[in-house]
């Protein structure tokens, strides 16, 4: 999605998108891992932790972000993510790593994670901007950072 932003067709700027994806990934990891280790479903190939499919959840998370960002400006791009995510889900079934219910639940968790991120991010971002008496949100930039040694937050404030 970030590469497509260069064409200027996105709904939100890249900083907002980065924050939305990071929040959605956090929701997704928390939900899928909690369920995966609580349920303990055995995989079709005998391995542990089948339900839900984390690969499918991540694939549909990406597809749903693309849909939310590009559905109004570039529908082909918006819907193509779902085709790729469906391919990932089918590959998990084909490779005998998941049951059908696993990939359906994974798709649901991925989409739900994005919806939760979009519901929570903007009110929080706007409240922070109002709290520090800013008229717009372009003076404050907060973005997650990742490295092999850990993660953190990047904070930039124009004054």
Q: What does each model-found stretch correspond to?
A:
Residues 1-3, 138:
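Generic low-polarity alpha-helical segments
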Residues 3-10:
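Structural signal for the C-terminal ends of transmembrane alpha-helices
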Residues 21-22:
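Acidic/His-rich structured neighborhood in mature extracellular/periplasmic domains
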């Amino acid at each position: 999605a970030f590469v497509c932003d260069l064409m200027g067709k996105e709904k939100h700027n890249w900083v907002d998108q980065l924050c939305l994806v990071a929040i959605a990934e956090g929701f997704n990891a928390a939900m899928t891992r909690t369920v995966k280790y609580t349920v303990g479903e055995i995989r079709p190939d005998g391995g542990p932790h089948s339900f839900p499919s984390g690969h499918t959840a991540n694939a549909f998370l990406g597809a749903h972000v693309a849909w939310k960002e590009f559905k109004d400006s570039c529908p082909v791009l918006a819907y193509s993510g779902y085709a790729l995510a469906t391919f990932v889900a089918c590959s998990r079934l084909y490779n005998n790593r998941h049951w059908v219910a696993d990939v359906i639940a994974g798709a649901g968790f991925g989409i739900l994670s994005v919806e939760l991120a979009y519901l929570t991010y903007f009110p929080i971002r706007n409240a922070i901007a109002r709290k520090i008496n800013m008229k717009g949100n372009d003076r404050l930039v907060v973005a997650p950072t990742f490295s092999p040694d850990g993660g953190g937050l990047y904070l930039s404030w124009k004054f």
